[in-house]
Amino acid sequence: YLDDLIARFGIGFPTTKIFSDYARITLPDIQPIENPDLALFAFMEREEILFRTLEKHIIGERLSQGFDGDVESFISFSLSVQNRRKSRAGLAFENHLEYIFRILGIKYDRTAVTENKSKPDFLFPGKEEYHDPVFNPLNLTMLGVKSSCKDRWRQVLSEADRIDEKHLLTLEAAISVNQTNEMQSKNLQLVVPQKIHSSYTREQQSWIIDVSSFTEIVKDRQKTAGIKI
C-alpha cells in the first residue's frame, strides 16, 4: 500500500477523517448493512495496517536524518509518535462507527453537550431530542466509545443524566469479571464486536451484546419515537 499512500498523502499524515475514509475505500466488499460487527473490525484492522505502513516510512525518513546528539529533540519526537498513535486509534474507532451509523440510517449527534458540559461520544437520536423535556427518555441512547477500557469506563456514567442505562463500546478483550460485574451494577451495558466475544467467559458473553444488537436497539427506539431519516 505504500506507493499509493505516498501518492495520495505525500510525506505527511492526513487528518484522521481522511485516513479513515481511505481505509474503507480499500475494502469495497465490506458492507456494514450485512454485518456491522465484521465491518467495524475489518475497517479498524485495515486502518491500523495502513497507518503503520505510512508511519514506518515517515519515521524512517526522520530517523535517517539523525538528531545530532540532541536528546530533547529525540524525546520530543518519540513522544509525538506515541501520542499520535493513541489519539488516532480512538478517533479512527469513532470515525468508522459514525460511517456505520449513517449507512444503517441511524440518527445521532457526535460529542453533543449534555449536563455539566459533558460530551458523550454518541447521542441518539441527538442533542435536540435529549434537551427536549417532552421527548421520552426511554427513546434516548448514549454510547461511550473506548478502544481500551481499563478504569476509564467510569467516565461515561455521568455523561447523560436523562439516560438511565448507558452503553459502552470497546475493542478490549477479556475484561475481568470483577470489572464487568461492576459495570452491570452501575447499569452500564458493554458492547463488544462479535469477533472478540470468545475472549470473555460464558457468563460474561450471556450479558455482553455485539454491535449489530446495539444498532437494532437504537433503530427500534428511533422507530418508536417516529423519527425518520
Model feature map: region roles:
Residues 3-91:
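Interdomain/boundary linker segments immediately adjacent to catalytic/signaling cores
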Residues 141, 164-170, 187-191:
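Hydrophobic beta-strand segments of well-ordered beta-sheets in folded domains
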Residues 122-147, 156-158, 168-169:
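Conserved catalytic cores of phosphodiester-cleaving nucleases, focusing on short active-site segments
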